[in-house]
């Protein structure tokens, strides 16, 4: 296939137009008064969203050079979402500013490699400064404030704080859809284990890359399933029952996986396979925990039980199974006396444990079994409102977990302003071009504050000037339009979210400024005279 190549300034200009197309769309959502973006859906009603990564994911530009620039910024948002669960809009705004400043330096004659060195140095320094400023999250009020700031709703903040109080900071919290208008919290029996689907072809929801099974049968075994023939008899019974099946096994051969996937895709039966969590003896115990929760008979090698002899009575039941790439959550709505007995056995084993390793494993299993699963059931008047609310709650939940991991810093962009003040005169290099790279990052730290103020209807420049005059932890409350003690007002951000936003924005910016050529494929019978002056 033929290629078309752009060089130097022309290539950078095209990439920058793509960067601006995506960043200008995403940044309108930043802050407590950020606006929404409406997204066309091919086979569904339009979605109205406030989530940076969800917006960025949907943007495809006709011009391939611009599209490359847009996709690189989407990667910033996506990486930030993967690592911190929130902060995607902040990361996008920072990336746009850094790329603009970096390209300006290169176009003025600076050496891209040295500028890149300065960007990387500054980003790492900013990340360290943020960690040094971080305040540990202990109080219930802090958890509520983080969730409220992320979601833009005090009600959501309260619900997430209550959920964490009930199942613990490390407990399992899932977001589900309610049939009513109200958003409610419910705690049910369940557990989560650290293994996801054995093949991505089991996924039913491509957008979230998850699969959910309702009222499912459960097969729990420490056997390695080597041939399809071993499980054909029980699969035939499952097909007759017309119910989905979750298989939790030590391992499943690729040939067997292929057959199961093919049958699922054909609609013969609904099945998902996950490998067993843990290793060795601990794996057997965890499988027995799953069997007790689901009321399944644990099909054990040690007891010489064979997969070919399985009957329907050997399978367990679960109200809902949510299977993701790296974990599986099992939810049961019924109380089980066997589960209570299992919990008591674990408590006794903890008392009698002879090593720290054994105690730790037993405590982890006990926490998983006894903590239950908190379900946040999202209610709304319309499907469009429901989707938006669900996204906000998921972001807020991720932000709260990030805050528990690394702590919190002052919000409203003030933490980055304070780091700017600390570094603008102290982070210096003898090399002029490395210094230009440092300035690319340090000067960009003021941009989130500017954008938050602008979206709230204030002069971004004036607010930034005032922010620089405020004492430590004091800053602009964009919702109320006044300067306050941000910590007292509960305007806080998770350190991990802010830190990852800076690191990921700097990473892509450092790579983009070293670009001297852009190559795209020419499609046959298409008009390839792209207009670089427009964004399509």
UniProtKB/Swiss-Prot annotation:
UniProt: ATP binding residues: 29-32, 86-90, 412, 493
Broad EC category: isomerase
Catalytic activity: ATP + H2O + a folded polypeptide = ADP + phosphate + an unfolded polypeptide
Presence of keyword Chloroplast: no
SUPFAM superfamilies: GroEL apical domain-like (SSF52029), GroEL equatorial domain-like (SSF48592), GroEL-intermediate domain like (SSF54849)
Keyword Chaperone applies: yes
GO biological process, one term: protein refolding
Enzyme Commission number(s) from the entry: 5.6.1.7
Domain of life: Bacteria
Keywords, ordered alphabetically: ATP-binding, Chaperone, Cytoplasm, Isomerase, Nucleotide-binding
Transmembrane intervals: none
Main location: cytoplasm
Pfam families: Cpn60_TCP1 (PF00118)
GO molecular function: ATP binding; ATP-dependent protein folding chaperone; isomerase activity; unfolded protein binding
Function: Together with its co-chaperonin GroES, plays an essential role in assisting protein folding. The GroEL-GroES system forms a nano-cage that allows encapsulation of the non-native substrate proteins and provides a physical environment optimized to promote and accelerate protein folding.
Subunit-structure text: Forms a cylinder of 14 subunits composed of two heptameric rings stacked back-to-back. Interacts with the co-chaperonin GroES.
PANTHER family referenced in this protein's UniProt entry, alphabetically: 60 KDA HEAT SHOCK PROTEIN, MITOCHONDRIAL
Family statement drawn from the similarity comment of this UniProt entry: Belongs to the chaperonin (HSP60) family.
Name of this chain's protein: Chaperonin GroEL
């Amino acid at each position: 296939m033929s290629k078309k190549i752009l060089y130097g300034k022309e290539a950078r200009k095209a990439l920058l137009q793509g960067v601006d197309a995506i960043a200008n769309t995403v940044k309108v959502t930043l802050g407590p008064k950020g606006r929404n973006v409406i997204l066309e859906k091919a086979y569904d009603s339009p979605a109205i969203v406030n989530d940076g990564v969800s917006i960025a994911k949907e943007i495809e530009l006709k011009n391939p050079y611009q599209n490359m620039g847009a996709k690189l910024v989407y990667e910033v948002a996506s990486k930030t979402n993967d690592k911190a669960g929130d902060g995607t809009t902040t990361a996008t705004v920072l990336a746009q500013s850094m790329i603009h400043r970096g390209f300006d330096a290169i176009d003025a004659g600076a050496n891209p490699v040295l500028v890149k060195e300065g960007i990387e140095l500054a980003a790492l320094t900013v990340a360290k400064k943020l960690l040094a400023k971080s305040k540990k999250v202990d109080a219930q009020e802090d958890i509520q404030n983080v969730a409220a700031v992320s979601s833009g709703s005090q009600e959501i903040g309260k619900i997430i704080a209550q959920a964490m109080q009930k199942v613990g900071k490390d407990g399992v919290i899932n977001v589900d859809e309610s049939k009513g208008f109200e958003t409610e919290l419910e705690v049910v029996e369940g557990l989560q284990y650290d293994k996801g689907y054995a093949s991505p072809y089991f996924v039913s929801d491509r957008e979230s890359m998850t699969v959910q099974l309702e009222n499912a049968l459960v097969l729990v075994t420490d056997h390695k399933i080597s041939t399809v023939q071993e499980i054909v008899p029980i699969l035939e019974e499952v097909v007759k029952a017309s119910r989905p099946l979750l298989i939790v096994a030590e391992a499943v051969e690729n040939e067997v996986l292929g057959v199961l996937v093919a049958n699922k895709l054909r609609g013969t039966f609904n099945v998902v396979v996950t490998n067993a969590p843990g290793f060795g003896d601990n794996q057997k115990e965890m499988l027995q925990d799953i069997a007790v929760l689901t009321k399944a008979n644990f099909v054990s090698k040690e007891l010489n039980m064979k997969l070919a002899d399985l009957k329907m009575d050997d399978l367990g039941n679960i109200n809902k199974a949510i299977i993701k790439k790296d974990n599986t959550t099992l939810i049961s709505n019924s109380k089980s006396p066997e589960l209570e007995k299992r919990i008591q056995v674990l408590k006794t084993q903890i008392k009698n444990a002879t090593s720290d390793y054994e105690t730790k494993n037993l405590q982890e299993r006990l926490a998983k079994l006894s903590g239950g699963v908190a379900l946040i059931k999202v209610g709304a008047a319309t499907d469009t409102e429901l989707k938006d609310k669900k996204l906000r709650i998921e972001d807020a939940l991720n932000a709260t977990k990030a805050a528990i991991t690394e702590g919190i810093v002052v919000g409203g962009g003030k933490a980055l302003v304070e780091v700017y003040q600390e570094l603008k005169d102290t982070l210096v290099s003898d090399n002029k071009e490395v210094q230009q790279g440092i300035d690319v990052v340090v000067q960009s730290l003021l941009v989130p504050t500017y954008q938050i103020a602008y979206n709230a209807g204030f002069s971004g420049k004036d607010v930034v000037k005032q922010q620089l005059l405020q004492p430590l932890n004091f800053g602009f409350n964009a919702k109320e339009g006044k300067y306050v003690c941000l910590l007292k007002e509960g305007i806080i951000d998770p350190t991990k979210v802010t830190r990852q936003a800076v690191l990921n924005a700097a990473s892509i910016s450092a790579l983009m400024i070293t670009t001297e050529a852009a190559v795209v494929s020419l499609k046959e019978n298409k008009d390839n005279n792209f207009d670089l002056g427009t964004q399509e």
